[in-house]
Amino acid sequence: MERGMRLFSSLVLVLLLVTATEMGPKVAEARTCESQSHRFKGACLSDTNCASVCQTEGFPAGDCKGARRRCFCVKPC
């Protein structure tokens, strides 16, 4: 009986923790739009270099992505 009560208490505690984390304030994540850089040449090995080129194209940021290491410029949609 004591073991069953302990198991029940543990399950209730886990249930309360799960529901409490979902009751917090909801923050809407901004969508991001990506566009392959038109000015970046060669393999993209540095996110910093990619971001610099993307800024000249009017984007606030840029990242190297994919197996072929291409520079993608990123902005909020």
UniProtKB/Swiss-Prot annotation:
Signal peptide range in chain numbering: 1-30
Localization in the cell: Secreted
Xref: PROSITE patterns: GAMMA_THIONIN (PS00940)
Domain of life: Eukaryota
GO cellular component, one term: extracellular region
Keywords, ordered alphabetically: Antimicrobial, Disulfide bond, Fungicide, Plant defense, Secreted, Signal
Disulfide bond residue pairs: 33-77, 44-64, 50-71, 54-73
Gene3D superfamilies in the cross-refs: Knottin, scorpion toxin-like
A Pfam family reported for this protein in Swiss-Prot or TrEMBL: Gamma-thionin
GO BP terms in the entry: defense response; defense response to fungus; killing of cells of another organism
Similarity annotation: Belongs to the DEFL family.
Protein name (Swiss-Prot/TrEMBL): Defensin-like protein
